[in-house]
From Swiss-Prot:
Enzyme class: hydrolase
Record field: transmembrane: 4-22, 59-77
Catalyzed chemical reaction(s): Cleavage of hydrophobic, N-terminal signal or leader sequences from secreted and periplasmic proteins
UniProt topology in membrane: Multi-pass membrane protein
Keyword Hydrolase: yes
GO terms for biological process, alphabetical: signal peptide processing
Enzyme nomenclature, EC number: 3.4.21.89
Alphabetized NCBIfam families for the sequence: PRK10861.1, sigpep_I_bact
Residue intervals annotated with topology Cytoplasmic: 23-58
The gene coding this protein: lepB
Name of the featured protein: Signal peptidase I
């Protein structure tokens, strides 16, 4: 869908750009010549309305030429600078909430062509802890957003009971791994969020996330716990469901590695959601190739209070600002 929109935007910009050039370099000089001839023939100065009647500009040409600068600016900004995205799910809570509208820095990981997403100019690579928008490897039409936890060459081990990550850099190409990266965790505390569980009439299970004061409860809800996770020099909060256990049988098992251990190949990344028990991420479907990277999430520019798949019920202006 995103690539289709980009294709339509590129085509519209090219078509209106051609109209703008044709008008500027072909039709406009002819109109000016006819207007000058009319001025000479009348012997008096003609006003603009009269001159426009003498040499009118076709409506379709005027519309196309006037739209071109706007489309060109939108194309440049959206393709190479910043693109807006909406957060549709709770997988990155508490950092990003359902209903957040974010700005993604498109040039953070390379300047890419807007249609095929081929890198034209390399500008950088994800750093550990970056919040990254990328094309889902199993269906590139979908945009995902997760946190970059593992970089190329990292050995990632996830403890599904303690829900903690161990990272050993420099493990690719059969080399001996370097010392483990300092990954620290604060004490587990109750969070402000409650996850509710219910079933629709058809039997389909549904879930929602709500901010609920610590001294209150919510029907069919479980209060999530949280702690701070520090990956090197990046600290952020993660959420956990106290009673949840990962479905290890659904983990992506890398050939040659034990379950829940992965060595990130060159040019690929290991992504995880901050809402650890509510995130389908690299633990389940593997690595993200560098070619799939879209950009780095840098700011929230608007936020609506809403649940997944429902209409907004309010505006959260306090969330507008940078993302960490």
């Amino acid at each position: 869908m995103a690539n289709m929109f980009a294709l339509i935007l590129v085509i519209a910009t090219l078509v209106t750009g051609i109209l703008w050039c044709v008008d500027k370099f072909v039709f406009a000089p002819k109109r000016r010549a006819r207007q000058a001839a009319a001025q000479t023939a009348s012997g008096d100065a003609l006003d603009n309305a009269t001159l426009n009647k003498v040499a009118p500009k076709p409506g379709w040409l005027e519309t196309g030429a006037s739209v071109f600068p706007v489309l060109a600016i939108v194309l440049i900004v959206r393709s190479f600078l910043y693109e807006p995205f909406q957060i549709p799910s709770g997988s990155m809570m508490p950092t990003l909430l359902i209903g957040d509208f974010i700005l993604v820095e498109k040039f953070a990981y390379g300047i890419k062509d807007p249609i095929y997403q081929k890198t034209l100019i390399e500008t950088g690579h994800p750093k550990r802890g970056d919040i990254v928008v990328f094309k889902y490897p199993e269906d590139p039409k979908l945009d995902y957003i997760k946190r970059a936890v593992g970089l190329p060459g990292d050995k990632i081990t996830y403890d599904p009971v303690a829900k903690e990550v161990t990272i050993q850099p420099g493990c690719s190409s059969g080399q001996a791994c370097e010392n483990a990266l300092p990954v620290t965790y604060s004490n587990v505390e109750p969070s402000d969020f409650v996850q509710t569980f219910a079933r629709r009439n058809g039997g389909e299970a549904t879930s929602g996330f709500f901010e609920v004061p610590l001294n209150e409860t919510k029907e069919n809800g479980i209060r999530l716990t949280e702690r701070k996770e520090t990956l090197g020099d990046v600290t952020h909060r993660i959420l956990m469901v106290p009673i949840a256990q990962d479905q290890l049988g659904m983990y992506y098992q890398q050939p040659g590695q034990p379950l829940a251990t992965w060595v990130v190949p060159p040019g690929q990344y290991f992504m995880m959601g901050d809402n650890r028990d509510n995130s389908a991420d690299s633990r389940y479907w593997g690595f993200v190739p560098e070619a799939n990277l879209v950009g780095k999430a840098v700011a929230i520019w608007m936020s609506f209070d809403k649940q997944e798949g429902e209409w907004p019920t309010g505006v959260r202006l306090s969330r507008i600002g940078g993302i960490h």
